[in-house]
Amino acid sequence: MILIYTHKITPRLRFVVRHLFRRIMGANAELTDSVDDFVKHAGPKLTYARQPLQSEFFIRSNELLFDRNIEPQDIHWRDWEGVPCFFELDARSSIPFDVFAASFFLLSRYEEYLPHQKDDLGRFRAIESVLSDRQGAMKRPLVDLWALKLKEALVEAFPGIGFKDREYKVNVILTAISAHKYSYRSVSRHIFESFIDLGKLRFTALSARFKTVILGHKDPYDNYLELHQPLGEMGVQLFPFFQYSRYDVNDRNVSWSKSKYGFFLKHINDYLEIGYLRSRLALEDVGLFKLELKKMQQLLHRPLHKVVLSEHRTLLPDAYQELVQEEVKEDFSMGYADVIGFRAATCTPFPFYDLGLEVEQPLRVYPICVSHEALRPLDVETVEKQLITIANEVKAVKGTFCLQLSNKYIQKMGIHSITRFVKAVV
C-alpha cells in the first residue's frame, strides 16, 4: 500500500488519487493527514503538500485541490521527457509538475465551468480547451501517460513496489437516432419522402425504399446483429444505443407509438444489452427525458444504466446531474463530435466529479476518442490510418479505446469496412 501524506484531505484530491493509482496504475493508495502515521509507515510513501516532511518522495501541491472555487488557472506547458504537462514545480519536487492538480483539472472538465464560447448547439468547443494550445496534446491520453511516468518514478524510488497490470480494450458505441431508414413508417410518410427523393432524382433511394417496404428486404440501417458477430469474434464489445421518443422532424426517427418498433428493440435486446439514446428534444426538456427513459425501461422490463447524449451535448454539470438523479450508471458521451482526441485527456473510464457540489458522483464516464462525425468526410484508407494512430496511443497505456459510430455511418461504409477498421485497432 502506498501512503500519501497531505496537510488536508479533500474530495478533489481523493478523486484524482483513486483515478491515477487504482484505475490506471493498479495500486492501492491511501491518503493521510497524520504525520505520525506517515512516519511510522514502512512501505512506499510520498508527500503532497507545500513542504516536504523529511527527504521523502515529494510533490509540491498546487492550491487547486484544496480550493472550492472555480476560477481561471495559469496554464503554461512544458515538456517532461517527451510528454507535455503543466502546473510546473521547482527542483525540490521529485517530479517536475503537479500531476494531481493537472489531472484533476482535465478529468473534472474544470475549464468547461469557466466562461467560454460555445458552438451552435451550446457545446464546449475543442478549440477552447487548453489541450488545443499544445500541438498533438489532444490526441494523447495525457492523464494516463502522467500516471505511468509517476509509476516509473515510484518504482525507481521504491524498488519492489507492486502494481497490477491491466489489459487494452476496444469498445464500439453504436448510436441509432433513427433505427431504420424505411421500416415502420406510415404510408403517408413513405409517399411524402418518395416525392422528395423523386424531386431530387434520388432513384437509388426510391429503389431501396421499394425493396424494403414492398419486397420485404432488410432495412439498410438494420446492421446491429450483423456487426455483433464479427466484433464478438475479435473480443470487442458492442454497445448499441437507441432513441425511443416521439417523432421529431429533425431526427426523422421512428416514433415510440409504433408497436413494431418496440418489438424490434426487444428482439435486439435479446442478443445485446441496448442502452438509451437521449433525444435532442429530451436534452432541452428534463420532463421529456424522464418520460423517454421510463417508457423504454417499461418496454424492456429492466432498468437502463447506459446512456448516450445525442450529438455529444454534455453540458456540464446539468446533463450529468440529470443522469445521476435518474440513477443512470454509465455515460458514453464524453468526447468531441467533430474532432479526434481525448476531451478529458484520459482513455480510462472515470466517475463524474461534480464541481458544483464538490462530490464524486456514481456515474461512470467512458471517454470517446473517435466519433463518426470526425470520420465522415474521410476515405477508407485515411480513416484506418487515423484510427491506428490514436489506438496506438491507447495501447501504449493499456487503456480503453472507445469508437462511436452511427448506424447511418455503418450503412454508408459497409460492414466489411467497419470490421476492417476495428480489426486494425484491436
Question: Predicted regions: what is each one?
Answer:
Residues L13, L281-V359, K412-I415:
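Catalytic domains of cell-wall/extracellular-matrix polysaccharide-remodeling enzymes
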Residues G136, E273-G275, V339-R343, G399:
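Glycine-centered flexibility motif
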Residues M1-W256, T348-P349, L355-V426:
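Terminal accessory/targeting
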Residues T175-I177, L277, V307, L323, ...:
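Conserved, mostly hydrophobic/aromatic
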Residues A29-E30, L238-F239, G275, H305, ...:
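A local structural micro-motif
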Residues L20-I24, P230, H267, K295, ...:
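Alpha-helical structural signal in soluble globular domains
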